[in-house]
């Protein structure tokens, strides 16, 4: 029925209509429906009237007219009647056919967008692709109502959305669009009602392949008004091509064909109308030439076309006058010669064909005598006009055939979309044979509309036993029978009989025709009057003049003219007139009425094979005014178009009907009982399958009815919902497949990662283990080892500071100390450098030690003007290193012997010294001179060698302590010790390969997942003595740390028995909430910055975050405003320590064995853990953080146990150094230091001064 079956575009629209909801759609958080937030649509255009006439509160012709008028006045020219589009000609450009508007209709059903011809095109194209059914669009309405424009817009839309990037497909699209300007030039003309009136009918059939790409097209033309070639009424014009050609012909054509302006030719000047408002003939001529090029007409073919047009124009200038015998003669011989030149025939033959007629007499079936009968001026003029009309008519037919040849399908044709653009219904002051044929074809189209939308629909409801209230309508079948029937004879039959009876005399034939019409006087739709007859058409009563009808019906060219054309040497003329004159053929040739009737029936048959869509065009006024709306004329069109009846049937009818078999075939995916994984599984009959589908999709019973063989859907919204659910099924299946595939890919990735992780664990760490073992060999059993150096999990990782990591602190350090990109970072670690200070003892100071493939860097970090500065304190090329010296004890000190003339050798303490030796050895390709002895040698000053003694002292609490040139360290592991085996990792339960729900346990190919039922609780018999309870197999007892009091109390309760059990103690009280830090403002503070908190003296604020850079993040207790405040302006408020609770009561004496059995080593572990205190985190850089950024967490301590603190103080070094001068004044401290130096240097040389 041409109904658009395009689904809803989004879920919200579908759900708003109540279709296809899942049980999860109505429940959100807490089980409440999720209601979409309302948004004011300020840009939405307010609807004028109703966009669908079925929504009118009152159905009448006046109500329909009022709605159309209201919409017309506001520029809304399109309105629906269900799926029928009503279009009112605006006579102006509304800007509604742009590419942007076109794209807005792509992929939308008609309910989602305003009424438009693009929506009809989209529905037809979608239905063709989705249902594999041929489609057609029937455009009807009177002349000037906008049928041709609607057809052009349909072609525009289909060409844009039909896809296809292949060059041949694009060429087909271009050629189809090019047919519009070409055929309009040759088939359209200006009339009183329409400046671009189609004077022929056209059925364009677009051909598509299986994927919806256009592969070809065919055009069938009907009823070309060839009489317009030789005459027009005032203020009308000939066909457009004559004015385009005469105004814009190139000079070559003017010279070859003698072309002049249109005022010079009788056929183009008779009506004295040469120009049309809003039309540029010269520009249109160029567009016509371009269309010919696109379609593929060669230059020779174009030349022949314009040669024939020139001959027609010059034929019209051939005037006749009477000679002495009252016979016709041509007064201008030059015109005869030029016409003969254009037709490429003999000039004498032209003169004879136009002024004489050859008559042949027959006797007894034999050929008789042949006479040359001269013609009078009237007869000669008629022969001239007949030749001109025949030339143009055959030329037009040839152009259509040539276009079809270019548009021949270049692939397999699967489906078609037809567009019918034909004459509208015509009623003039004088109506002749042309109007009878045109109105007859419109009656046939109206009959199709009635049969498919009114009669057939109601008959189908009755046949299918659907509840239905019949609606009365006018069936125009009787009018069609009046014109076309043979028994009893209709108008065409009577006309043919008159032509056959009195074929020689036109006047006698017309009178015979009038006599035959008297037999039709009993028909209620026919009236006969003097010299005319009236037919009561569906669009109104039309009076037709009898005069000249028989001649027009004969539609025969005189044999004299055919002989003239056949004598031409121009092969193109022979192509235009392919039928040779058969002198012996006695059969009556088909008349014009016969041809029209056959064409109309063929058209009806073609349309019946397709699913039709309808566009009903309405002309608002006869003056082509963009503002005038003639109510009387519009109501007349509403009546004869049957819009009121169409509205009533659409309101009471069903939007969609389909056989049970096709319905189930289309929608079986929507029910789990009729399909599984896309496969059809229904085993019952088709009717029950259709009912099951409608039931499972929650379609209300009032929205459908089940007939005898078909399912009927009432509203298009229901159909759109079904289509949307069907489309979403495939989307959901695709999503499930994608989810399964992504899950499988994730599974494979996780498996690969596990394998890679295991392989790296096995092989990736071997390199670092080899380096560690190489370190043992480098030491060569000459140095005692620390226990940490020998643990099995120790690896020589090298770059502990991450200097080589991009985008991290490493980039900052590399750029600060100018490490080139060609240097590979081999080793980096924190260390301490022995630094000599004037007037003070040498002390270790924190540094960074970096080894590259070229240099050794000693990097210092310090604050300069409250900014962290990173400097390369020392850069030593590895080639300049003469030796590395270290002691034979377990201390971490070593020196790098360079022997520079300006700088001393560095003496460094680094916990990863052996690793440094290893990487340095590799960098030097094994040429490192490693000196290991009881002392460490180094140049304390340039050119002055000094030694540092290493002394073993078991009393040293830490690894080693440096003081006054001596390193004291505890005993270490034997020098020949090697690393212990790598410990096996802790056995933990294996994690699942993936968290996906679509994979079986163990990955693809595993056994099916079966959920074990949850066991029900069963009463168990517990032993009286809890100690006797047996531990489960494989589960070890884990002691829990408890206080001695609790253990003793538990032991006492266990031995006391169940009869004298004391009451349970009260539940412990909730621990107090942690108190928030507060501070009191000592001074007023108001900087005016947005990220700083103003303070008033004495004000109490809450401290949120304390930064070590001198700024605290505080919050005002009254306004809750947060901001940064200087630490110096605040005094923390220390909360009073609450008094300790009284000690617990003493316990009864317990045996040691009981306590030890209950909790082995429990108290000692607790106390030991509490005794160890974590080291303080390093201070962050001095930078005030932004208020919107979280404070940086404190950095975790490194494994090296070397502080990051860059302040050169004893506390920063972490070493045991003298601190007796820390609390003295500067002068006093200096004097005391000098006295200490003097006593320490007694008996020593000046070079041994460490102070």
Swiss-Prot record:
It is found in: Cytoplasm, Cytoskeleton, Actin patch. The keyword Transferase does not apply. The modification Phosphoserine is found at residue 369. This is Myosin-1. Residues 416-498 are annotated as: Actin-binding. Residues 1074-1135 form the SH3 domain. Its main location: cytoplasm. The lineage of its organism: Eukaryota, Fungi, Dikarya, Ascomycota, Pezizomycotina. SMART domains: MYSc, SH3.
């Amino acid at each position: 029925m041409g109904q658009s079956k395009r689904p809803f575009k989004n879920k919200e629209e579908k759900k708003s209509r109540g279709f296809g909801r899942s049980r999860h759609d109505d429940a959100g958080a807490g089980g409440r429906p999720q209601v979409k937030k309302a948004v004011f649509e300020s840009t939405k255009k307010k609807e004028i009237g109703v966009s669908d006439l079925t929504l009118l509160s009152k159905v009448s012709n006046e109500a329909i007219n009022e709605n159309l008028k209201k919409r017309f006045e506001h520029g809304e020219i399109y309105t629906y009647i269900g799926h029928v589009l009503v279009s009112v000609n605006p006579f102006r450009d509304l800007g509604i056919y742009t590419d942007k508007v076109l794209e807005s209709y792509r992929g939308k059903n008609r309910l989602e967008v305003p009424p438009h011809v693009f929506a009809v095109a989209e529905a037809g194209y979608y239905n063709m692709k989705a249902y594999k059914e041929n489609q057609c669009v029937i455009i009807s309405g009177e002349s000037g109502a906008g049928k041709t424009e609607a057809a052009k817009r349909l072609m525009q839309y289909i060409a844009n959305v039909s896809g296809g990037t292949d060059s041949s497909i694009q060429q087909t699209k271009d050629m189809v669009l090019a047919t519009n300007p070409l055929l309009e030039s040759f088939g359209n003309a200006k009339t009183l009602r329409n400046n671009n009136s189609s004077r022929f009918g056209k059925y364009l059939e677009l051909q598509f392949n299986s994927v919806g790409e256009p592969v070809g097209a065919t055009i069938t033309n009907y009823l070309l008004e060839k009489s317009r070639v030789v005459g027009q009424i005032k203020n009308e014009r000939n066909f457009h091509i004559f004015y385009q050609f005469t105004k814009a012909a190139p000079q070559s054509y003017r010279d070859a064909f003698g072309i002049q302006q249109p005022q010079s030719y009788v056929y183009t000047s008779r009506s004295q109308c040469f120009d049309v408002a809003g039309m540029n003939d010269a520009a249109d001529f160029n567009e016509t030439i371009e269309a010919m090029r696109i379609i593929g007409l060669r230059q020779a073919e174009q030349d022949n076309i314009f040669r024939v047009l020139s001959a027609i124009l010059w034929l019209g200038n051939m005037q006749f006058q009477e000679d002495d015998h009252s016979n016709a003669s041509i007064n201008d011989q030059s015109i005869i010669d030029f016409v003969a030149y254009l037709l490429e025939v003999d000039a004498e033959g032209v003169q004879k064909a136009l002024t004489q007629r050859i008559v042949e007499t027959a006797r007894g079936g034999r050929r008789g005598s042949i006479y040359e009968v001269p013609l009078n001026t009237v007869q000669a003029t008629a022969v001239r006009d007949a030749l001109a009309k025949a030339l143009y008519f055959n030329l037009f037919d040839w152009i259509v055939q040539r276009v079809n040849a270019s548009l021949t399908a270049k692939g397999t044709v699967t489906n078609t979309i037809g567009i019918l653009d034909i004459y509208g219904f015509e009623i003039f002051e004088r109506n002749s044979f042309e109007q009878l044929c045109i109105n007859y074809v419109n009656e046939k189209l109206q009959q199709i509309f009635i049969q498919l939308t009114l009669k057939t629909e109601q008959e189908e409801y009755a046949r299918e036993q659907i509840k239905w209230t019949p609606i009365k309508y006018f069936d125009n079948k009787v009018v069609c029978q009046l014109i076309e029937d043979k028994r009893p004879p209709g108008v065409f039959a009577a006309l043919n009989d008159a032509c056959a009876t009195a074929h020689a005399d036109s006047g006698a034939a017309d009178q015979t025709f009038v006599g035959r019409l008297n037999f039709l006087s009993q028909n209620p739709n026919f009236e006969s009057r003097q010299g005319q007859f009236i037919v009561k058409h569906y669009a109104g009563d039309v009076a037709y003049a009898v005069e000249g009808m028989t001649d027009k019906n004969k539609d025969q060219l005189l044999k004299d003219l055919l002989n003239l054309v056949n004598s031409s040497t121009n092969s193109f003329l022979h192509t235009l007139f392919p039928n040779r004159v058969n002198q012996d053929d006695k059969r009556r040739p088909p008349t014009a009425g016969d041809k029209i009737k056959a064409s109309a029936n063929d058209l009806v048959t073609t349309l019946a094979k397709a699913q039709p869509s309808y566009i009903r065009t309405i002309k608002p006024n006869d003056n082509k005014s963009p503002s005038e709306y003639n109510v009387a004329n519009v109501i007349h069109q509403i009546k004869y178009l049957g819009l009121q009846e169409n509205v009533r049937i659409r309101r009471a009818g069903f939007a969609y009907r389909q056989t049970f078999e096709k319905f189930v075939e289309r929608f079986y995916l929507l029910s789990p009982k009729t399909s599984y994984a896309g496969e059809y599984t229904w085993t019952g009959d088709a009717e029950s399958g259709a009912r099951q589908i409608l039931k499972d999709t929650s379609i209300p019973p009032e929205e459908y009815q089940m007939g005898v063989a078909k399912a009927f859907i009432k509203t298009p919204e229901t159909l759109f919902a079904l289509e949307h659910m069907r489309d979403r099924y495939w989307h959901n299946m695709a999503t499930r497949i994608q989810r399964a595939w992504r899950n499988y890919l994730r599974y494979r990735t996780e498996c690969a990662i596990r394998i890679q992780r295991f392989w790296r664990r096995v092989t990736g760490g071997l390199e670092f283990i080899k380096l560690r073992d190489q370190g043992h060999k480098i030491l060569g059993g000459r140095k005692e080892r620390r226990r940490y150096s020998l643990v099995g999990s120790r690896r020589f990782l090298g770059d502990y500071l991450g200097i080589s990591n991009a985008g991290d602190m490493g980039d900052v350090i590399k750029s600060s100390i100018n490490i080139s990109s060609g240097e590979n970072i081999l080793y980096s670690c924190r260390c301490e450098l022995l630094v000599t200070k004037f007037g003070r003892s040498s002390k270790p100071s924190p540094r960074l030690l970096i080894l590259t493939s070229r240099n050794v860097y000693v990097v210092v970090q310090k604050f300069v003007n409250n900014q962290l500065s990173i400097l390369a304190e020392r850069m030593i090329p590895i080639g300049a290193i003469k030796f590395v010296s270290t002691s034979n004890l377990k201390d971490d000190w070593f020196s790098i012997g360079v022997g520079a003339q300006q700088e001393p050798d560095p003496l460094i303490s680094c916990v990863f010294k052996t690793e440094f030796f290893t990487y340095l050895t590799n960098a030097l390709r094994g040429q490192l001179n490693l000196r290991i002895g009881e002392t460490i040698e180094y140049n304390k000053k340039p050119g002055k060698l000094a030694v540092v003694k290493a002394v073993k002292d078991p009393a040293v609490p830490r690894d080693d302590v440096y003081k006054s040139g001596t390193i004291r360290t505890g005993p270490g592991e034997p020098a020949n010790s090697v690393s212990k085996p790598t410990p096996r990792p802790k056995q933990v339960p294996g994690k699942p390969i993936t968290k996906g729900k679509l994979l079986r346990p163990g990955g693809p190919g595993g056994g099916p997942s079966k959920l074990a039922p949850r066991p029900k609780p069963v009463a168990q018999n517990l032993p009286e003595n809890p100690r006797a309870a047996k531990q489960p197999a494989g589960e070890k007892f884990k002691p829990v740390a408890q206080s001695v009091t609790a253990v003793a109390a538990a032991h006492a309760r266990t031995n006391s028995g169940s009869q004298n059990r004391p009451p349970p103690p009260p539940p412990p009280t909730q621990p107090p909430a942690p108190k928030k830090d507060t501070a009191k403002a000592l001074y007023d503070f108001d900087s005016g910055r947005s990220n700083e908190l103003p303070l008033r003296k004495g004000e109490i604020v809450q401290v949120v975050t304390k930064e070590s850079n001198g700024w605290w993040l505080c919050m005002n207790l009254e306004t809750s405003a947060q901001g940064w405040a200087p630490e110096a302006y605040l005094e923390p408020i220390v909360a009073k320590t609450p008094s300790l609770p009284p000690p617990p009561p003493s316990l009864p004496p317990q045996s040691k064995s009981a306590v030890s059995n209950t909790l082995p080593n429990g108290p000692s572990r607790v106390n030991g853990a509490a005794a160890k205190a974590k080291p303080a985190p390093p201070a962050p850089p001095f930078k005030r953080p932004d208020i919107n950024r979280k404070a940086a967490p404190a950095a975790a301590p490194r494994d090296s146990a070397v502080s990051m603190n860059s302040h050169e103080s004893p506390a920063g070094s972490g070493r045991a150094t003298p601190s007796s001068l820390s609390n003295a004044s500067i002068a006093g401290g200096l004097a005391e230091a000098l006295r200490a130096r003097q006593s320490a240097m007694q008996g020593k040389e000046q070079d041994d001064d460490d102070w």
